[in-house]
Regions:
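Gly/Ser-rich oxyanion-binding loop with an adjacent helix/lid
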Residues: 1-82
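C-terminal nucleotide
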Residues: 66-185
C-alpha cells in the first residue's frame, strides 16, 4: 500500500516486485541485488530519472528489523539492527504528490557531479561519500561556485549523518539516530 508519487519509492517498489514475480514465475537465475540493478536501469533508461541504486537496493535486500548501510560506490553493505524498545516509526502521507521525473533531482545530481569534477582537478577524490566533513571544508574552495558547493556539502554531510546514525543503531541507541535525520537539509 505505497501511495504513488508520495516520496516512498513507489516506482522502485514496483520495479523490484515485478522482478521478483518474473524471476519466480520463469525461474530466472538472478539475485535480489541483480533485480535492484535492473530496477535502477529501468528508472534511468525508461523513466528518465538519473537515480542511484539506494531505493531499489533497500527494497530488494531489505531485512526485517534492520536498516541497510549501503556504499553505493561498490554496493558493499551491512545490516544495522533496529531495536525500537517500544518506540514506533510513523510514516504519514501528506497527499503532496512528488515525482522524481518532474523534480529537480536530475539537476541536483548533475550539480553534485560537476562539483566533484572541479574538485578532482586538484585532489584525488573518488566520490563525495569518501570525504569527511573536515576534508570537504579543506577542498570546497576548488568548486568555485556557491550553488555547486552547497550541493556537494549536502552530499558529504548527509553521508556523515548516515554513518553516525548507523553507529547509533549498532549500539541500540535509537534516540541518537533521530537527530541526524532531523537535521537533514
Amino acid at each position: 500500500n505505497i501511495p504513488n508519487g508520495s516520496g516512498l519509492s513507489s516506482s522502485a517498489s514496483v520495479e523490484v516486485l515485478t522482478g521478483f514475480i518474473l524471476r519466480d514465475f520463469f525461474g530466472f537465475d538472478v539475485t535480489n541485488q541483480d533485480l535492484a540493478l535492473i530496477g535502477q536501469y529501468s528508472e534511468n533508461n525508461f523513466n528518465g530519472v538519473n537515480c542511484g541504486i539506494m531505493d531499489q537496493f533497500a527494497i530488494a535486500m531489505g531485512k526485517k528489523d534492520h536498516a541497510i548501510f549501503l556504499d553505493t560506490a561498490d554496493l558493499s553493505y551491512t545490516y544495522a539492527p533496529i531495536h525500537l524498545s517500544g518506540a514506533k516509526i510513523v510514516i504519514a502521507c501528506s497527499n503532496k504528490k512528488r515525482g522524481l521525473g518532474d523534480s529537480k533531482y536530475n539537476e541536483r545530481r548533475s550539480e553534485c557531479e560537476e562539483a566533484l569534477r572541479r574538485v578532482q582537478k586538484v585532489k584525488k577524490v573518488e566520490n563525495w561519500g569518501a570525504l569527511t566533513e573536515a576534508e570537504f571544508e579543506e577542498i570546497k574552495g576548488a568548486i568555485g561556485d556557491e550553488v555547486l558547493e552547497r550541493r556537494a556539502k549536502h552530499a558529504v554531510y548527509e553521508n556523515q549523518r548516515t554513518i553516525k546514525a548507523v553507529a547509533a543503531l549498532q549500539n541500540n541507541d535509537i534516540t541518537l539516530g533521530v537527530p541526524p535525520a532531523a537535521s537533514s537539509g
